[in-house]
């Protein structure tokens, strides 16, 4: 296919148009009085949302060059969402501000590489200062504050705080759709580990691409299963019970995997195979954790056990197992409470004895998985459209809360970004590097400016006043008052704010140094076929 190429100013201007289209669409959602965006879906009702990354992913522009600019901003939103789980709209606003100011200076003759160095230096300083002014999130009240700000609902904030209190900060919290109209919290005992199914043909729910096993047997082994004959006697016993099977093994390959998949597809029995979690001695310990949780036995040479001699009595049991491409969650294992408590006590002793930070972290993860359980937030709403929107907000709130627990929190509403301007502006530099620093200083004002404008206030006036008030005081766009942001519960996770700035600066700096853009040349539409003059003319002389 032929290519179309644009250079220098033409290339950057086209990409800026794409950046503006996407950012202008997303930024109307920022802040407590941000609006929603309606997204057309190919089937079903439209999606109404204020989630930045969801909106960004939907935008495709007809012009290839403009679309590349839009996709770069979408990448910023996606990357921020992957790292922190929230802050995608802030990241989009920051990207647009840096790109706009940067391109003005590049067009005026500034050196893009000098500007890039200035942007990187300013961003590094701003991130360091964000960490300096952040505070630790370790109370239920602080967790509820963060979740409430992210979701825009105090009820959701309290719900997530309750969930984290019950399963611990490292516990597993999932979000499901409720059959009723109320949103509620359900906590079930369970364990999750980061291993998914070995074949996508094992899924039972093609929409979610996950396998759900109700009341399954669980085979736990540190051996590799390559020969189906090794487990054939066991499979025949399970077949008589008409129950599904989860296989957790070192690996399942050779003839064994296709044989299991074929029987699954034919409906002979429902089976899912996953690799054992962890490595080396840690893998053995985690398999033992799973065995104790489910009331099973690890089939291992250490105990003199062979796969061909395994019986149903050696298998674990659970009320439900959910497996997707990345994770396996075991819910309500059938292990005895006494055995689980003894295992928890053993792990706690090991945590107290170890001198390695890495080992301590891994032991705490095992403890959380064994004792924490799984919290399920069941989202309810009157309509499907409202349900989808609320579910997205709760997911954002959960991600924001975890980010806050990890790196602390700062004043919300764009206040923290303005608070670090003093340190950034004080950096000593010359020429185009100094210009790059000034670009970031200007961009740091943009989120609060947009929040104010979305709430009906003059952004420039709010920014000027914010620069002259005490640290921690900020503008509450919900009611137009100047308050202590932390006391008012208006806080953002440091990780979210930091990730938004870093990702925005990274992509913007690359875009500013772009000198040529290559895109597919649109093919002309094929001409309509000419009609045969002898057709359709019957009866005429």
Curated annotation (Swiss-Prot):
Family: Belongs to the chaperonin (HSP60) family.
UniProtKB keywords: ATP-binding, Chaperone, Cytoplasm, Isomerase, Nucleotide-binding
UniProt superkingdom: Bacteria
Pfam families: Cpn60_TCP1
Record carries keyword Translocase: no
Protein's gene: groEL
Record text on subunit structure and interactions: Forms a cylinder of 14 subunits composed of two heptameric rings stacked back-to-back. Interacts with the co-chaperonin GroES.
Official protein name in the record: Chaperonin GroEL
Binding site for ATP: 29-32, 86-90, 413, 476-478, 492
């Amino acid at each position: 296919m032929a290519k179309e190429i644009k250079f220098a100013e033409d290339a950057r201007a086209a990409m800026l148009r794409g950046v503006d289209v996407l950012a202008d669409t997303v930024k109307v959602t920022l802040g407590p009085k941000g609006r929603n965006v309606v997204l057309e879906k190919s089937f079903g009702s439209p999606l109404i949302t204020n989630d930045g990354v969801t909106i960004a992913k939907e935008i495709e522009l007809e012009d290839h060059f403009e679309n590349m600019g839009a996709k770069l901003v979408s990448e910023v939103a996606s990357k921020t969402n992957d790292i922190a789980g929230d802050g995608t709209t802030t990241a989009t606003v920051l990207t647009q501000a840096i790109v706009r100011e940067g391109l003005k200076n590049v067009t005026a003759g500034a050196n893009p590489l000098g500007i890039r160095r200035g942007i990187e230096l300013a961003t590094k300083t701003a991130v360091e200062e964000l960490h300096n002014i952040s505070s630790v999130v370790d109370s239920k009240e602080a967790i509820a504050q963060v979740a409430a700000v992210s979701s825009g609902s105090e009820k959701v904030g309290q719900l997530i705080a309750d969930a984290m209190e019950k399963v611990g900060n490292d516990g597993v919290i999932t979000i499901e759709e409720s059959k009723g109209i109320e949103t509620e919290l359900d906590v079930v005992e369970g364990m999750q580990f980061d291993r998914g199914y070995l074949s996508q043909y094992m899924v039972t729910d093609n929409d979610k691409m996950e396998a759900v096993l109700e009341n399954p047997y669980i085979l736990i082994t540190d051996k590799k299963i390559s020969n189906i004959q090794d487990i054939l006697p066991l499979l025949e016993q399970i077949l008589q019970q008409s129950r599904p099977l989860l296989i957790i093994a070192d690996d399942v390959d050779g003839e064994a995997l296709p044989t299991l998949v074929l029987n699954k597809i034919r409906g002979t029995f429902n089976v899912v195979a996953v690799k054992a979690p962890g490595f080396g001695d840690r893998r053995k310990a985690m398999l033992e954790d799973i065995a104790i949780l489910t009331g099973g036995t690890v089939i291992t040479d250490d105990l003199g056990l062979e796969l061909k001699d395994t019986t149903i009595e050696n298998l674990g049991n659970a009320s439900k197992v959910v497996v997707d491409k990345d994770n396996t969650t075991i819910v309500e294992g059938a292990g005895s409470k006494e055995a689980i408590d003894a295992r928890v006590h053993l792990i706690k002793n090991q945590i107290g004895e170890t001198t390695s930070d890495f080992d301590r972290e891994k032991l705490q993860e095992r403890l959380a998985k064994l004792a924490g359980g799984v919290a399920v937030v069941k989202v309810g709403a009157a309509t499907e459209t409202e349900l989808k929107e609320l579910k997205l907000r709760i997911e954002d709130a959960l991600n924001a809360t975890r980010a806050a627990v990890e790196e602390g929190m700062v004043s919300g509403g764009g206040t923290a970004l303005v608070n670090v301007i003093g340190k950034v502006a004080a950096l000593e530099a010359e020429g185009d590097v100094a210009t790059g620093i000034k670009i970031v200083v200007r961009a740091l004002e943009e989120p609060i400016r947009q929040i104010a404008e979305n709430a009906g206030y003059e952004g420039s006036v709010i920014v000027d006043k914010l620069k002259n008030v005490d640290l921690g005081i900020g503008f509450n766009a919900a009611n137009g008052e100047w308050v202590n942001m932390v006391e008012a519960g208006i806080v953002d996770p440091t990780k979210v704010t930091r990730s938004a700035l870093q990702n925005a600066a990274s992509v913007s700096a690359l875009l500013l140094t772009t000198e040529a853009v290559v895109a597919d040349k649109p093919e002309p539409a094929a001409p309509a076929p000419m009609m045969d003059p002898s057709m359709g003319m019957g009866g005429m002389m």
